[in-house]
Amino acid sequence: MVLSQKLHEAFKGTVERITGPRTISAFKEKGVLSVSEFVLAGDNLVSKCPTWSWESGDASKRKPYLPSDKQFLITRNVPCLRRAASVAEDYEAAGGEVLVDDEDNDGWLATHGKPKDKGKEEDNLPSMDALDINEKNTIQSIPTYFGGEEDDDIPDMEEFDEADNVVENDPATLQSTYLVAHEPDDDNILRTRTYDLSITYDKYYQTPRVWLTGYDESRMLLQPELVMEDVSQDHARKTVTIEDHPHLPGKHASVHPCRHGAVMKKIIDVLMSRGVEPEVDKYLFLFLKFMASVIPTIEYDYTMDFDLGSSST
């Protein structure tokens, strides 16, 4: 951790200790949440997405302003099938990256495009119009194919004398070589990782905060530095930091919340301009949707099929 980050965390911790949590809603005005709104949004996420659950965490680290059994949200064993760098070109080709906030070159990607791998394969598929289908190539009917009604041509197994029909020198029985299956080169195997994702309430920034705990294919804990391989290169080392988890032991990679409120405010403004009145209990669905641009290959559940809010039209 660099000195500036250490100083900021020390300052942030001091402010959190001497100030109380937000109690007045500023969801639409600032894109932030009060503690009660965070719990409300968390309850809705758990209800709509059963893979998410509330956790109490380490008793010594519990925050008094949160319910003891609802200290943070977590979803476990989330698959990550490939590294973030492998899809960067796909996103660019799909033209799906849109900066929600690009002030001071600190923008966030609102969404991302779809991979184009399948499209390439489809380009190589022949058209049905190009196939020359004629009557001569059609499959014969079953009776004709197997000899029709001419049963007399089919030999009777009872006519075979086993002693006279044994082939003693069948080449197939003398085959001395056989095929051996070899494992592919390890360098060509894409290792599937899994992640535990947790969401905490950041009292200083008054927004949710995502934390990542990664595991390799053998369920061995990933070093936080390796987690960066599964973070969009636009955000790795810039908006993703390695810090102490507020409720769990050890260092964890985390998406820093310094811009969360501003980004959420812009998303809310866009929805309202389209005649949709966002509801605060849907906050985490929107939040996790824009988080997908930071960790595009970690396939967590945030339920795309949901009502963003009540339409004013």
From Swiss-Prot:
Superkingdom as given in the UniProt entry: Eukaryota
Single GO cellular component term: cytoplasm
Bias-annotated ranges (Basic and acidic residues): 114-123
Subcellular location: Cytoplasm
GO molecular function: ubiquitin-like protein transferase activity
Active site per UniProt: C258
Keywords associated with the record: Autophagy, Cytoplasm, Protein transport, Transport, Ubl conjugation pathway
BP GO terms, sorted: autophagy; protein transport
Residue numbers spanned by region Disordered: 103-125
InterPro entries noted in UniProt: Atg3/Atg10
A Pfam family annotated for this UniProt entry: Autophagy_act_C
Function: E2 conjugating enzyme responsible for the E2-like covalent binding of phosphatidylethanolamine to the C-terminal Gly of ATG8. This step is required for the membrane association of ATG8. The formation of the ATG8-phosphatidylethanolamine conjugate is essential for autophagy and for the cytoplasm to vacuole transport (Cvt).
Assembly and binders: Interacts with ATG8 through an intermediate thioester bond between Cys-258 and the C-terminal Gly of ATG8. Also interacts with the C-terminal region of the E1-like ATG7 enzyme.
Similarity comment: Belongs to the ATG3 family.
Stated name of the protein: Autophagy-related protein 3
